[in-house]
Amino acid sequence: MAGCCCLSAEEKESQRISAEIERQLRRDKKDARRELKLLLLGTGESGKSTFIKQMRIIHGSGYSDEDRKGFTKLVYQNIFTAMQAMIRAMDTLKIQYVCEQNKENAQLIREVEVDKVSTLSRDQVEAIKQLWQDPGIQECYDRRREYQLSDSAKYYLTDIDRIAMPAFVPTQQDVLRVRVPTTGIIEYPFDLENIIFRMVDVGGQRSERRKWIHCFESVTSIIFLVALSEYDQVLAECDNENRMEESKALFKTIITYPWFLNSSVILFLNKKDLLEEKIMYSHLISYFPEYTGPKQDVKAARDFILKLYQDQNPDKEKVIYSHFTCATDTENIRFVFAAVKDTILQLNLREFNLV
């Protein structure tokens, strides 16, 4: 104790700084314990970015008029991307236009440089409307599993009159439906009951997955999204590989990573609305011969796909929490995420000094 009296002013200042650093480190450690890191994983187009948008709507500031205006150009571009995909598929699938005029309309739309689109001209709108009404294009749309077409194509094309209005401002649903492939890593933090939920969305395409490694530290939970409707579709990157087989293989890889041994796993079986439509005409057994349930049975199909993923889990002690979702339905996601939040908090009670 006597030695302390002999400390120089410089040494006292050094001790004070050391003590302050120690206090700050303790505070940081406590703060870190009050932050949950949720890693959103899944193959491309499984609905991860839409889920993040829903978190912003439900638990964040939502989308103001100004925010939504910022999506106008993307809505237009999504429409051209969809129509161009169908025009190309008309050639590939050798489907004829019923209306002769639509050959010219198709040429007009084909020449559009999508990434430069910022407006819709009257000629373009008329061409798109006539094409969409053509029975040939409708047949092509019905065969969309044979090529790559965004899930939002029908939503936008059937609403082209509203979207073409001069004063058009995208609605919340328009924003949720916009498709922009995620490149890189997007973080979205939001505060719930004094705990920060930090949601991390990473690109689902194969080329993006090598970037995931940086996200693997201290992950509380993995939310893995599966597109239920992709059982009969092929990959954008490889046209002879089934999308669901790829998703299933990725899920197995993720849940057996050593980094995630202590992370809870939540499975979102997404796009349940699209499965309900598709199962009526595209039979599961044609793509998964091991399916023994009845045709056109939504519940049997959902249960079969859930079991496909549960069977990838080698650790039978590890619980996989599952939910059937529709990421474009705000009320469905509000309900599901409330259950997910409770599950995550229950699993982390001690960590967060909640007991």
Swiss-Prot record:
Which parts of the sequence belong to the G-alpha domain?
A: 34-355
Sorted alphabetically, which keywords does the UniProt record give? GTP-binding, Magnesium, Metal-binding, Nucleotide-binding, Transducer
- Where are the stretches annotated G3 motif? 197-206
Q: Which GO terms describe its biological process?
A: action potential; adenylate cyclase-modulating G protein-coupled receptor signaling pathway; phospholipase C-activating dopamine receptor signaling pathway
Q: Where is this region: G4 motif?
A: 266-273
Q: Which GO terms describe its cellular component?
A: cytoplasm; heterotrimeric G-protein complex; plasma membrane
User: Quick one: which residues bind Mg(2+)?
Assistant: S49, T182
- Region described as G5 motif: 325-330
Q: Where does GTP bind?
A: 42-49, 176-182, 201-205, 270-273, 327
Pfam families, alphabetized = G-alpha
Where is region (G2 motif) located?
Answer: 174-182
Q: Which GO terms describe its molecular function?
A: G protein-coupled receptor binding; G-protein beta/gamma-subunit complex binding; GTP binding; GTPase activity; metal ion binding
Q: What does this protein do?
A: Guanine nucleotide-binding proteins (G proteins) are involved as modulators or transducers in various transmembrane signaling systems.
> What PANTHER family does the annotation carry?
GTP-BINDING PROTEIN ALPHA SUBUNIT, GUANINE NUCLEOTIDE-BINDING PROTEIN SUBUNIT ALPHA-14
Its name, as the record gives it, is Guanine nucleotide-binding protein subunit alpha-14
**Species of the source:** Bos taurus (Bovine)
